[in-house]
């Protein structure tokens, strides 16, 4: 909504433009009227809409045509004043003033016009019969007000309508020639209907209508008022009411009726509550609320985000099979102007046996998005109606920004639940199979997977009876060069092919170049463990290398034995959670034992504190 309103008064000489302004300000008819009134500014606190309003007078005798053109450009609304007793001043509306204001403007970008019939005290009848054909000819005319500067009749109403034409414009909502809502307005209201239809039955029940009414206007409708609304819709539409509720067509008809009856502000209140601006686009403030993430911090969905997303999942899981089919997923995202999840999502997350997105996989994908691109995540939550349905100021309440990693290291514990593991190794070592195995997919099933290839896989790993999210990112490079940004992560998995004698050279080089002094935990993984292990051409064997650099002994993986490798993903998660134990001992057994003991002690301490707190209460 505009922050201020600029009203320009035009019309033939002696029609009373200046008198109208002075009567409004002085609240009495002026005895002496100057040729032109100075610009008046009405403070926000004395206007009905609480917006500062500037009123500008124009006089042909004092101002040039160039000044007039400049004032028209600056104006938000133009009041064309005519004398109800002088027919020629009415004719000038059509032949002079409207062409002057909007002659070169395209449809939809015209300045709104209010027709003002002054000196109604000098005429017994109304001029509306003469004015109506003009109003029908020019769609930019919002309304016509007959008033009297002398009797102060309709003076405040005149400026209220002018203000309203700017703050609640008709043009973006309604086409007066076609007598129907514009396509952009239909799209916006359809999204609002979909968000408000909380059970996805395509009908707004009484409970949903009251929820909607309270959200937009602060109070629920009285039962009789609710019935009256439905009766009006039922009488005027063939499909507006169904099962005692309002359909989308009924909802659209109701808003059309508001506009046709001059109650544009009702529809605008609804639109603005759901984040729309004057062009019927969602505002940047709504879609992209400010969220500051310091260096070393990460972002995760919190309990509010989970709660909202689970409600959304249940709403669109129409067959209640705890999975979203492609059609159900498309419906879920129908309130967005584009499909936000590409086919790679099916390669990122665990799927059902039918290759549908399970509830668990759905939450995994949202966690992945929140971690990798939190601002895109906020945008998606905004489109889906998170602030409205969760009654929150904005989407940032769904996100937790974790504390800096350096503080976690100092405290030797973390409250984070999402960790990133870079899987690094030369091409052909089996990194993709390692990611697929994390999602419990066999190599035989790869032909059935609907997803496009992805460099990410996310799943949960149970650590001390708590689920943590582990993101695996495949880093595939042709040479031994790896940028520092590519190396940053919570834990690095350096993968080599046990059957390729040159494979480990790459891992050793990457470790020395990026991880040896980084403090990032590293786990060496020998892939293709079902094949015969050959001696590596590196100066040391992988085990000797790990011993020398105080790394845990190498782990082994085979894509043919996916069900036996759960412990590998657990150990990667452990290492990410407790980086301070990295390199604390050369023995693999001792390393994992220290990690396990650390986690157990932390869990026991937390339980003891909980019991002590409970007793105190």
UniProtKB/Swiss-Prot annotation:
Protein EC: 3.6.5.-
Membrane topology category: Single-pass type IV membrane protein
Positions annotated to bind GTP 2: 428, 430-432, 528, 530
Mitochondrial intermembrane side: 614-617
GO molecular function: calcium ion binding; GTP binding; GTPase activity
Residue intervals of the Miro domain: 2-168, 416-578
GO biological process, one term: mitochondrion organization
Protein name, entry field: Mitochondrial Rho GTPase 2
Residue positions binding GTP 1: 16-19, 59, 118-119, 121, 149-150
Assigned keywords, A-Z: Calcium, GTP-binding, Hydrolase, Magnesium, Membrane, Metal-binding, Mitochondrion, Mitochondrion outer membrane, Nucleotide-binding, Repeat, Transmembrane, Transmembrane helix
PANTHER family xrefs: EF-HAND CALCIUM-BINDING DOMAIN-CONTAINING PROTEIN 7 (PTHR46819:SF1)
Gene: rhot2
NCBIfam families: small_GTP
Organism whose genome encodes this protein: Danio rerio
Protein family (similarity comment): Belongs to the mitochondrial Rho GTPase family.
Catalytic activity: GTP + H2O = GDP + phosphate + H(+); ATP + H2O = ADP + phosphate + H(+); UTP + H2O = UDP + phosphate + H(+)
Positions contributing to Mg(2+) 2 binding: 432, 474
């Amino acid at each position: 909504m505009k922050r201020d309103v600029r009203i320009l008064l035009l019309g033939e000489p002696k029609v009373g433009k200046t008198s109208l302004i002075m009567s409004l300000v002085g609240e009495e008819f002026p005895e002496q009227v100057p040729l032109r009134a100075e610009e008046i500014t009405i403070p926000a606190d004395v206007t009905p809409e609480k917006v500062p309003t500037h009123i500008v007078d124009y006089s042909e005798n004092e101002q040039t045509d160039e000044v007039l053109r400049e004032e028209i450009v600056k104006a938000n609304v133009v009041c064309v004043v005519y004398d109800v007793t002088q027919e020629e001043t009415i004719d000038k509306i059509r032949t002079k003033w409207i062409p002057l204001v909007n002659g070169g403007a395209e449809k939809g970008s015209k300045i709104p016009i209010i027709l003002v019939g002054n000196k109604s005290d000098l005429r017994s009848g109304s001029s509306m019969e003469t004015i109506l054909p003009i109003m029908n000819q020019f769609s930019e005319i919002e309304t016509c007000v007959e008033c009297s500067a002398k009797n102060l009749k309709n003076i405040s109403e005149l400026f209220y309508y002018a203000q309203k034409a700017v703050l609640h414009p008709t043009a973006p909502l309604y086409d007066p020639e076609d007598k129907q809502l514009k396509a952009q307005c239909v799209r916006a209201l359809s999204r609002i209907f979909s968000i408000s239809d909380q059970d996805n039955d395509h009908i707004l029940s009484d409970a949903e209508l009251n929820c909607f009414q309270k959200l937009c206007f602060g109070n629920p409708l009285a039962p009789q008022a609710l019935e009256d609304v439905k009766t009006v819709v039922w009488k005027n539409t063939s499909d507006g009411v169904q099962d005692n509720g309002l359909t989308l067509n009924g909802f659209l008809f109701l808003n059309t009726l508001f506009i046709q009856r001059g109650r544009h502000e009702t529809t605008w209140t609804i639109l603005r509550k759901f984040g729309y601006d004057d062009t019927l686009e969602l505002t940047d403030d709504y879609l992209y609320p400010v969220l500051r993430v310091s260096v070393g911090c990460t972002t995760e969905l919190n309990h509010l985000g989970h709660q909202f997303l689970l409600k959304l999942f249940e709403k669109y899981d129409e067959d209640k099979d705890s999975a979203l089919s492609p059609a159900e997923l498309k419906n879920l995202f129908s309130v967005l102007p584009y499909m936000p999840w590409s086919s790679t999502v099916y390669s990122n997350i665990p799927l059902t046996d039918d290759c549908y997105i399970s509830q668990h996989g759905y939450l995994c994908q949202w966690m992945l998005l929140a971690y990798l691109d939190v601002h895109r995540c906020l945008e998606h939550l905004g489109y889906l109606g998170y602030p409205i349905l969760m009654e929150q100021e904005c989407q940032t309440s769904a996100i937790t920004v974790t504390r800096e990693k350096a503080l976690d290291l100092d405290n030797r514990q973390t409250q984070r639940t999402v960790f990133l593991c870079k899987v690094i190794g030369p091409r052909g070592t089996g990194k993709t199979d390692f990611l697929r195995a994390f999602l419990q997919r066999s190599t035989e099933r790869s032909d059935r997977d609907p997803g496009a290839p992805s460099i990410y896989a996310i799943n949960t790993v149970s650590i001390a009876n708590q689920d943590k999210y582990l993101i695996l990112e495949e880093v595939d490079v042709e040479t031994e060069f790896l940028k520092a940004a590519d190396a940053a992560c919570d834990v690095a998995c350096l993968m080599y092919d046990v059957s390729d004698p040159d494979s480990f050279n790459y891992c050793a080089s990457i470790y020395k170049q990026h991880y040896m002094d980084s403090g990032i935990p590293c786990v060496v993984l020998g892939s293709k463990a079902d094949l015969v292990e050959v001696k590596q051409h590196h100066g040391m064997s992988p085990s000797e290398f790990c011993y020398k650099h105080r790394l845990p002994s190498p782990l082994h993986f085979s894509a043919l034995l996916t069900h036996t490798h759960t412990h590998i993903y657990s150990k990667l998660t452990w290492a990410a959670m407790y980086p301070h134990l990295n390199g604390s001992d050369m023995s693999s057994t001792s390393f994992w034992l220290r990690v396990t003991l650390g986690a157990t002690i932390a869990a026991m301490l937390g339980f003891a504190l909980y019991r002590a707190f409970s007793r105190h209460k």
